[in-house]
Amino acid sequence: MSSFQSTAAVRACARRAASTTSAATLASTTCRAAASRIQLQGQRSAGLVPKSWTRFSSSSIANDNQQKMLASHLQTADPVMYDIIEKEKQRQKQFINLIPSENFTSQAVLDALGSPMQNKYSEGYPGARYYGGNEFIDASERLCQDRALETFGLDPKEWGVNVQALSGAPANLYVYSALMDTHDRLMGLDLPHGGHLSHGYQTPTKKISFISKYFETLPYRLDEKTGYIDYNKLEELAITYRPKIIVAGASAYSRLIDYARLREICDKVNAYLMADMAHISGLVAAKVMPGPFTHADIVTTTSHKSLRGPRGAMIFFRRGVRRTNKKGEEELYNLETPINASVFPGHQGGPHNHTIAALAVALKQAQTPEFRAYQSQVLANATALAARLGEPKDKNGLGYTIVSGGTDNHLVLIDLKPQGIDGSRVERVLELVGVAANKNTVPGDKSALTPGGLRIGTPAMTTRGFTEEDFARVADIIDRAVTIAVRINKAAKEDAVKKGNEKAANRVKTFMDYLGNGETDPEIVQLRSEVESWVGTYPCPWDQSS
C-alpha cells in the first residue's frame, strides 16, 4: 500500500469513527488509533506537538498489532492453555475435594489476582520503596496489613505483620533466619506424627528439609497410645536440647494445640514460641477455635487453606515488652526489623502485589458473618465425618481407626493399617472415582512413600455447600473405595505371583499397574458415575452455570 493510500485509509477510518455513535465502532482499536493519529497530525501542523512525538505510520501499524495481541483473552491468545484450564475447572467441579489444605477461593479474590497490580515492581516496604510509582501499591499493602490485624483482633501497638512472604514454608524459613544463626536449635512436631516439612524434618539417614541442614532440629512427637502431643516428653527434650525456637503447628494433627503449655515450656528454656497456624487460620479468624496469639511470640500462616484467600502468607510478630529480667528491667521484643529484613532483602526481591491485593480482599471477607457461619459448618462437618467413619458398626459407624479418636478442627486422619491397606493405594482408587484425598503418615509408620494413613478435610466441600448429611455420604464413598482397593491389591499380588514375580507382589507399582485407569472395573466405573452426578450439582465460586 502506498503512503497516499495508507493516509487515505487512516482518514477514512477516522471519519467513520467520528460519524457514528456505534459503541462497537468507537471501540475499534484501529479506528481509535487512526483518529488519534489524525489529531496528532493536526497538532503537529499547528506547531503544538514536536515532530519527534508523533509515530510513523509503519511503526504505528506494528504497534497496533502488538496491542491487539496484548488485548486478546486467553481463549484467543493460547487455546492450548485455555483448554487445560477448562479441563481443570471441570475436574474441580466434578470431584469431591477432601484435601484439608485446599479450598475454593472467591470470585473477588480471583479478580484481584488477575488485576494489573501484578504489573508493578515494588522492592521494599510502604513508604520506602526502591522504585517510583508505588502510591497505590503502598495503599494496597497497608490496607492488607490493617485488615490482617483487624481480622485476628490484634492491637497494632502489640503486633505487627509482614504480608510479603510468598507462601508458608518460605515464611517459616524467613522467621528462622531472622532469629537464629546457622546451627542454632529448633524443635517442631515430627512429620510422621502430623508435623510439616518446614519445621525441620529429617530421617536418621537424610536431612529431607533444607531447614534441617541450615539449623539443628529435634522433633517432638505424639503419645502413640492417645494420638495427642506428648507435652511432658516435649518438655523433657526441650530442657535437655535448649532450642532457640519451638514451633507449635501441624499439617495433620486433628486436635487443639495447648499453646499455654508450650508457652510455659518456652519460658523455661528461654525459647521463642512460633505458631504455624497455616491450616487453622480461617477457624481462628472466625473465632470458632482458640488461636495462638495470646501465648506466641511469632505466628505464621498461609492464606489459601481455611482462610480461603490467595496463595500467600503472613508473618505476625510481637511488639513491646517481652519480659522482665531478674534485675526488674523490661526487655523489649526485637522481632520486627529482623523479620522484615529477612523477607526483604534477605530472601525475596519484589513482592507479588496482585497476591497482596487479593489477600486484602480475602481478609475483608473473613470479617463477615457469612465467613463465621462457614467456619462453624467446617467444624460441624468434620465432626460428622469423623463420627461416621470412626464409630463402631453397631452404632451406625464404619469402624475405622481415627488417629486420636476424633477431631477438634477441620481434618480427620484415618489409620488404614487395620484394613490391611495403605494410603497410597486408597488415594489412587479414590482419585479414579472422583475423590481427591491424600495419603499421610500416621504414628508407627516406617515409610513416607507407603504411609498407613489417609488425610481428609472439610473446608473445600463446605465452601461448595456440603453439610453433615453430605459428609456422612462421603464417609460411605471412602469405605467403598477402601473395599475396592483391598480387593484389587489382593488380585494384583496373586497376578504377580502367578507370573513368577513374587518379589514385586507387595510393591505399590505392581498395584498401580494392575489397576490402570480403572475403566475395566465395574465398581470403579459405577462409583465414579455416582460421584460425578452428585457433586456436579453443587456450585463452584467461579462457575456461573452452577
Swiss-Prot record:
Keyword RNA-binding belongs to the record: no
Subcellular location: Mitochondrion
Presequence positions on this chain: 1-64
MF terms in GO: glycine hydroxymethyltransferase activity; pyridoxal phosphate binding
Chain coiled-coil ranges: none
Broad enzyme group: transferase
Enzyme Commission number(s) of this protein: 2.1.2.1
Entry keyword set: Mitochondrion, One-carbon metabolism, Pyridoxal phosphate, Transferase, Transit peptide
GO cellular component, one term: mitochondrion
Domain of life: Eukaryota
Transmembrane segments: none
Cofactor: pyridoxal 5'-phosphate
Assembly and interaction partners: Homotetramer.
Family, similarity comment: Belongs to the SHMT family.
Function: Interconversion of serine and glycine.
Entries under NCBIfam families matching the protein: PRK00011.1
Protein name per the record: Putative serine hydroxymethyltransferase, mitochondrial
